[in-house]
Swiss-Prot record:
Entry EC number(s): 5.3.3.19
GO CC annotation: cytoplasm
CC cofactor: Fe(2+); Co(2+)
Protein name as annotated: H2HPP isomerase
Chain's role: Part of the bacABCDEF operon responsible for the biosynthesis of the nonribosomally synthesized dipeptide antibiotic bacilysin, composed of L-alanine and L-anticapsin. Bacilysin is an irreversible inactivator of the glutaminase domain of glucosamine synthetase. BacB catalyzes the allylic isomerization of the endocyclic-delta(4),delta(8)-7R-dihydro-hydroxyphenylpyruvate (en-H2HPP) to generate a mixture of 3E,7R- and 3Z, 7R-olefins of the exocyclic-delta(3),delta(5)-dihydro-hydroxyphenylpyruvate (ex-H2HPP).
Subunit structure: Monomer.
Encoding gene, per UniProt annotation: bacB
Example of a GO MF term: cobalt ion binding
Transmembrane segments: none
Keyword annotations: Antibiotic biosynthesis, Cobalt, Cytoplasm, Iron, Isomerase, Metal-binding
Native source organism of the sequence: Bacillus subtilis
InterPro entries reported for this sequence: Bacilysin_H2HPP_isomerase (IPR052535), Cupin_2 (IPR013096), RmlC-like_jellyroll (IPR014710), RmlC_Cupin_sf (IPR011051)
Pathway: Antibiotic biosynthesis; bacilysin biosynthesis
Enzyme class label: isomerase
SUPFAM superfamilies cross-referenced by the UniProt entry: RmlC-like cupins (SSF51182)
Length: 236
């Protein structure tokens, strides 16, 4: 029998701090086959190219980062693009600015999944629309993953309780809101991550005056399945 504390640690794992010699700080949250990293990159800092067996996806939350995947380098500004580094593909980054950069990276290796990417490894915004009245969302899509940036309006804006076949992970990147998974509720603040497995009931409500913002990742895509199928057909 799991205690309330056990359930909270399952759905909202306590992040562990990783400090690197170059000054980069990362807060790591893990459930199962997936790790969420919230990274703080100091000004004029280089993250040397490296590779690993996991796929890695990411985006910049604050600031500007020069990101290299394979032999492709692109400047990434906050929430304007995402990258995919497939398994064993070298990737690194450099903060060339005078400001600290905050980025989110997700590492994953799950049996049965195939990790495709665009030829240049970077995803542009696919579309922006209202998911619910007043809740604007922006999507980045590849055939096995969908990234959704969501604004939850203040003063009671909510994502009603629901469940689906997709695995869902989310990170609060602005404001705050209450997130509940299978009856376990946590106050989401900047950097808090949640992990929701398929068919686990979940919902969110913003009781604050200001809008909140979150990054939500779906495996496989939930809202843009047709786009994903077209990408899959193109690859085959």
């Amino acid at each position: 029998m799991k205690t309330e504390q056990d359930l909270q640690e399952l759905y909202f794992p306590t992040p562990k701090l990783i400090e690197w010699d170059n000054g980069v700080r990362q807060y790591s949250s893990v459930r199962g086959d997936t790790e969420v990293l919230l990274s703080y990159v100091p000004p004029h800092t280089n993250v040397e190219p490296h590779q690993h067996k996991e796929v890695q996806i990411g985006l910049v939350v604050s600031g500007e980062l020069s990101m290299t995947v394979g032999d492709v380098t692109r400047k990434m500004t906050a929430l304007e693009s995402a990258y995919i580094a497939p398994p064993n593909v070298p990737h690194g980054a450099r903060n060339e600015t005078d400001q600290e950069v905050i980025a989110i990276d997700i590492k994953r290796l799950k049996a049965g999944e195939t990790y495709t990417s665009p030829e240049d490894y970077f995803l542009n915004i696919f579309k922006t629309r209202d998911l619910l009245p007043g809740m604007e969302v922006t999507f980045f899509v590849e055939d096995w993953v969908e990234i959704m940036l969501a604004n939850i309006p203040g003063n009671g804006g909510e994502m009603p309780f629901h469940k689906h076949r997709n695995e869902q992970i989310g990170i609060c990147i602005g404001g705050g809101y209450d997130m509940t998974i299978e009856g376990c509720k946590v106050d989401m603040t900047f950097g808090t991550a949640y992990f929701c497995d398929p068919r686990e009931d979940h919902g969110a409500i913003n009781r604050f005056e200001k809008d909140s913002k979150s990054v939500n990742i779906f495996f496989p895509p939930r809202y843009n399945r047709a786009k994903a199928k077209k990408l899959e057909a193109k690859e085959s």
